[in-house]
A protein has these predicted regions:
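S-adenosyl-L-methionine-dependent nucleic acid methyltransferase catalytic domains
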Residues: 1-154
Length: 154
């Protein structure tokens, strides 16, 4: 009998799962599974989901691709995090940009910082995404909903 190893037997992104679990634990009353039972209800949903997916997903000869697929399924990849992003203020993007870019893309009056109306929405979105991509995983999580809070197959 040939035993094909599961993803969880070859690798498991413990650090990322731990960070997501911590974010879910901080939600206290907003946790999804607490009312479902004594044992499973105490485990963060992202941890339960990642273990089940890690057990069901076979490992291939390409560990990097396996990890990409695993993170994509759990919306923990770059695009998934962006999809989960609740919103970044114009002020945060403004502070991150160079002085030249600030003048080009923003209007400042007193303490009010707003996007310049002459910029296409796609350009504002591109700069916001660029700022988001420059953040560490921990910093990105501050702007993100939990995976189960977004629409779609999460």
């Amino acid at each position: 009998m040939v035993h094909n190893k599961a993803f969880i037997e070859e690798q498991f992104p413990v650090s990322l799962i731990s960070k997501e679990s911590y974010k879910e634990r901080k939600a206290v009353a907003g946790q999804t599974l607490t009312g479902l039972g004594k044992w499973w209800g105490r485990k963060p949903l992202i941890l339960v989901r990642s273990v089940i997916i890690g057990l069901l997903m076979p490992a291939s000869d390409n560990p990097k691709k396996d990890r990409e697929i695993f993170l994509k399924i759990l919306t923990m990849d770059a695009d998934g995090l962006w999809q989960r992003c609740k919103g970044i203020t114009a002020k945060e993007v403004y502070e991150w940009l160079s002085e030249t870019e600030r003048e080009k893309y923003f209007n400042v009056s007193g303490k009010s910082i707003r996007w310049n109306n002459q910029n296409p929405k796609q350009e504002c979105d591109r700069l916001t995404r660029k700022y988001f991509d420059s953040l560490s995983y921990d910093e990105k999580l501050e702007y993100c909903d939990r995976p189960e809070q977004i629409a779609g197959a999460s």
